[in-house]
Each structure stands twice: as structure tokens, then as C-alpha cells.
Amino acid sequence: MEHYRKAGSVELPAPSPMPQLPPDTLEMRVRDGSKIRNLLGLALGRLEGGSARHVVFSGSGRAAGKAVSCAEIVKRRVPGLHQLTKLRFLQTEDSWVPASPDTGLDPLTVRRHVPAVWVLLSRDPLDPNECGYQPPGAPPGLGSMPSSSCGPRSRRRARDTRS
């Protein structure tokens, strides 16, 4: 790839993993260059001011961690929020062009699967049986687990323990 330079990157559209959201939900699309201070200022202002009852932080790739951090900070500052977290992979299409046009190389298009996260914080109760639900006040990682399976499990095959 040393003979190519990146021309652009486009995130391919994908359906939201939370289609049942009320229309007045505040959606915070976190990007890699987003300032946490700015994101929190808007989200906390709306939640504490009472103009929003739900907020969704979404981020993909390197911004996924920043989206989770924003949600955790909001949960600390606004007590009693219910949380629903969804994880998916999104497709990203990268365009690469030859570094010098006289090399005879063709432009390339590469599709990558990048991790993405959506974190819904709500003042209203959410379905506790939905996969990814965490009740208010629960420590991270200790959300209620529904009795049924939450989706596909790892596709890894069991290790062969024979010597």
C-alpha cells in the first residue's frame, strides 16, 4: 500500500439497532474528532433541563470508546437513568488512489467492518428483558441478563484438548 494514498472513507448506511425510539430522542453522533466537553454540554443541558427524556450516544471505529465514555459520564451526573446498549459492525468503504499517476496502478476500493456502539439513556423505564439492558444504579457489567439467549454466541470452535 506504500504506492497508494487514501482518497476518502465513507460509512455505508445501515439501519438503526433501536428503531422503536420516540421521535423526540436526542441523538448524539460521536466522531473521532468530537470534543467530549461539547457533547456533554448539549446532552446534559437537555436532560437536566427536561426537554429530553432519552439520549442516544452512537459511535463507530475509534469513536466507539468515546461514545461509551460520554454515556458513563452522563449516567454519573444524572441519577436514575435506564441504559440499553447495542453493538454491531458497520461497513466502511475506503478509496485509495495511486500516489503517483504514472505508475499504471488502478484506484482501489476497500470495504472494512468496523465496530459500532449505540447507548440509549432514558429517564423512562425500558424493557428489562431486552439484551443490553442495565437498570439505574447498577455497576458497569452487572446489568440484568435475560433468561433467554441474547443473540449469536461466539462462532469459535472448541479447542482440541487431545495431546
Curated annotation (Swiss-Prot):
Intracellular or extracellular location(s): Nucleus
Positions of region (Disordered): 1-22, 129-163
UniProt biased composition (Low complexity): 143-152
Keywords attached to this entry: Nucleus
InterPro entries: Alba-like_dom_sf, Alba-like_NAB, DNA/RNA-bd_Alba-like
Cellular component terms (Gene Ontology): nucleus; ribonuclease MRP complex
GO terms for biological process, alphabetical: tRNA 5'-leader removal
Lineage: superkingdom: Eukaryota
Coiled coil regions, renumbered to chain: none
Biased segments, Basic residues type: 153-163
Function: May be a component of ribonuclease P or MRP.
Family: Belongs to the histone-like Alba family.
Name of the featured protein: Ribonuclease P protein subunit p25-like protein
Source organism (scientific name): Homo sapiens
Gene: RPP25L
